[in-house]
Amino acid sequence: PLYEGQPLEGLHLGDFIKNWPPALRAIFIGLSRNFLSAHPQETPLSGFIGFLRFYMLLRRDAWAFSYMPDDGGTSLIEPLVHKLYEKGGATALGCTVTHLRREAEGWRVHWHDTQANQDRSALARQVILAVDASNAEKILRASPETSASAAGLYWPRAMPTAVIRLWFNRTPDADVEAGIFSGECILDNYFWLHRLQNAYIEWHRATGGAAIEVHVYGPPELLQAPDAVLLSRAINDVNGAFPELRNHIIHQVIQHNDPTHTVFGVGPAGQHLEVTTPWPDLFCCGDWVRYPSPALFLERACITSIAAANAVLTAHDLPLWPLLPPPPPERLAGWIQRLMLRGRRARRQRDARR
């Protein structure tokens, strides 16, 4: 769907699998919840096929995760901010962008500074909206030059989530680093942090303990339950998967996340915002943006960010940052893919002649 620009509009995974055998349907329900954070009836078929194709079918090595050595702040955000300061840039915390206004020399960005309780603005020749879909929609609907068009655009849904971490005074028997839950569980996927992140690895070496991070992707009504209920059910799910850990828990925390987790789908051409928007000098990036790359999630956010930065560099006649192409499919998968593409092209040509 991403390569061919096929939105499969109005179709959801639930429509596709409703008549499948129960066991096979259960597998796809688990995949939908764990990788696109939604139940099949809420998962756009285009997004699911895009995920399945790139992350499971074309290359076996795509099944393996790559992990940051530390938390996201230490590994990614703090180095980026440091580099920004090093280059003369600045950040403003506690501020909410309210709208944009087009002026002769660029875009005036308006925001509310909650710490000073003041409205402020700044003029920029180019602007990149590096925000989630729902906040991009709010900003563009509130901006005079973009509001009319924004009302008719395709905006992917975003879901609230919860992250739970549990600490144990012993390790699980299974030598695994990550996996998914399926069946009658509230949890969706898990990661054993003492096998992945430096701080937890050091703690494990010192204590012999283990720590797991589990994600809860909804439904929204589940996430509204009291924290004590969510923690109790999460511990029960982990104990069910790793019974040797029962009665060995020593600490637990839960974090609720705002509804910014994208349920990706491919919107109709001209209605799904791309990196280059219909408005001059205004660009978008994020995991929800339409772009030819087959990658999703954090990878998509990074790729579209580089593409948006390149658009600004182009406007200033500066060298571009190279974008790495996705790895090619393995031989058998590539052969099947070429056959399918050839067949679809032939079918479209036949339909056009009728």
Model-identified regions with their sequence ranges:
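Conserved flavin/dinucleotide-binding core of flavoenzymes
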Residues: 173-354
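Rossmann-like flavin
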Residues: 1-53
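Active-site rim elements
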Residues: 2-4, 63-69, 151-152, 219-225, ...
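Helical element adjacent to the flavin cofactor pocket in flavoenzyme catalytic cores
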Residues: 51-126
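Generic structural signal for well-ordered, non-membrane alpha-helical segments
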Residues: 6, 10, 25, 69, ...
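Mid-domain catalytic core of redox enzymes
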Residues: 93-223, 228, 232, 236-242
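Residues forming the flavin
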Residues: 69, 75-82, 96-98, 113, ...
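Amphipathic alpha-helical segments that form well-ordered structural scaffolds
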Residues: 12-16, 31, 75-83, 233-240, ...
